[in-house]
Swiss-Prot record:
Protein's UniProt name: (+)-6a-hydroxymaackiain 3-O-methyltransferase 1
Lineage summary: Eukaryota, Viridiplantae, Streptophyta, Embryophyta, Tracheophyta
Gene3D superfamilies for this protein: Vaccinia Virus protein VP39, Winged helix-like DNA-binding domain superfamily/Winged helix DNA-binding domain
Job of this protein: Methyltransferase involved in the phytoalexin pisatin biosynthesis. Has both 3- and 4'-O-methyltransferase activities. Can use (+)-6a-hydroxymaackiain, 2,7,4'-trihydroxyisoflavanone and with much less activity (+)-medicarpin as substrates, but not (-)-6a-hydroxymaackiain, daidzein, formononetin or isoliquiritigenin. May be involved in formononetin biosynthesis.
Recorded name of the encoding gene: HMM1
PANTHER family registered for this protein in UniProt: O-METHYLTRANSFERASE
EC supergroup of this enzyme: transferase
PROSITE patterns in the cross-refs: SAM_OMT_II
Length: 360
């Protein structure tokens, strides 16, 4: 190899090296975050009620004295990444000491809060989600339609969850945690639900989203529709009930059908079935309702590169776990029109997701 380069080429080479190394070692930041969550660092600082010094934090976490410097170095990385912030406090002797406080991001890891997303972090970084990448080369070369997860484990993710109660509970907790943040979207987009008398939350799990909608709009009769083994033992009330069934066969009738975090699990063929069944469900009593989709709408030309990167990463997650996909506006439009709908409206919500209203 010829290492004779001019200044411009040297600079380009160094920047390329930094870019490569950064992506190679991105996993360190993820695992440091997981360690912080498992140690309960955010909980410790929150419960302390004020900025926390390194010795105070180490003592609260009951760490061995030899690990104090290791904790410092983890905190240095996590602080650089925006999960904690540093401030200065006075010690009992009047000397200034560095102390740590929570940031908006680490507040999402505080246990017991309605906005806590610890279960999502735990699920995304669980060995079952990471180990599959070891067979990616085999997956690319084999002539078989299966997920990367199935290639690695011999079973699809849904079957894995149904056999592993701990993983199923973790998955349901993660979905419920994500749904709790949906409350903000409801408050900011009340007009979407105004005028509705009934709504079906398809694949609504244990009813977290339906309950939020019911709280905000008590007059709306909400039905949570999911697999019988998911909703079979759940109890509702006069305006909130649970129905078991198969969304690929039919969907209960209502003024509106909600598909939150559903269609990205499935390829276009299966998503088309769900949408057609949803269209039939809202066409009753001589009037047409609407389908409300909560999902990602990828904008590859967005000025927010971080947002687009997250959306594209989610797309690869859906691909490797479920053979699903995150869709661009053009892909959403084709899917919606192929299902027989006449118009739609996309509204960005919840940071990186979109609310898509679809009409017959």
């Amino acid at each position: 190899m010829d290492f004779s380069t001019n200044g411009s080429e040297e600079s380009e080479l160094y920047h390329a090296q930094i870019h490569l190394y950064k992506h190679v070692y991105n996993f360190v930041s993820s695992m440091a975050l997981k360690s912080a969550m498992e140690l309960g660092i955010a909980d410790a600082i929150h419960n302390h009620g004020k900025p926390m010094t390194l010795p105070e934090l180490s003592s609260s976490l009951k760490l061995h004295p030899s690990k104090v410097n290791i904790l410092y170095r983890f905190l240095r990385l996590l602080t650089h990444n925006g999960f904690f912030a540093k401030t200065t406090v006075k010690s009992n002797e009047g000397e200034e000491e560095t102390a740590y406080v929570l940031t908006p991001s680490s507040k999402l890891l505080v246990s017991g809060k309605s906005t806590c997303l610890s279960s999502l972090v735990k699920g995304a970084l669980h060995p079952s989600s990471l180990d599959m990448w070891g067979v990616s080369k085999k997956w690319f070369h084999e002539d078989k339609e299966q997920t990367l997860f199935e290639c690695a484990t011999g079973e699809n993710y849904w079957d894995f969850l149904n056999k592993d109660s701990d993983s199923l509970s973790m998955f349901q907790d993660a979905m419920a945690a994500d749904s709790r943040l949906f409350k903000l979207a409801i408050q900011e987009n009340k007009h979407v639900f105004e005028g509705l008398e009934s709504l079906v939350d398809v694949a609504g799990g244990t009813g977290g989203v339906a309950k939020l909608i019911h709280e905000a709009f008590p007059h709306i009769k909400c039905t949570v529709f999911d697999q019988p083994q998911v909703v079979g033992n759940l109890t509702g009330n006069e305006n909130l009930n649970f129905v078991g069934g198969d969304m690929f066969k039919s969907v209960p009738s209502a003024d509106a059908v909600l598909l939150k975090w559903v269609l990205h699990d499935w390829n276009d063929e299966l998503s088309l079935k769900i949408l057609k069944n949803s269209k039939e469900a809202i066409s009753h009593k001589g009037k047409d309702g609407k389908v409300i989709i909560i999902d990602i709408s990828i904008d590859e030309n967005s000025d927010d590169r971080g947002l687009t990167e997250l959306q594209l990463e989610y797309d690869v997650v859906m691909l490797t776990m479920f053979l699903g996909k995150e869709r661009t506006k053009k892909e959403w439009e084709k899917l919606i029109y192929d299902a027989g709908f006449s118009r739609y409206k996309i509204t960005p919500i919840c940071g990186f997701k979109s609310l898509i209203e679809v009409y017959p």
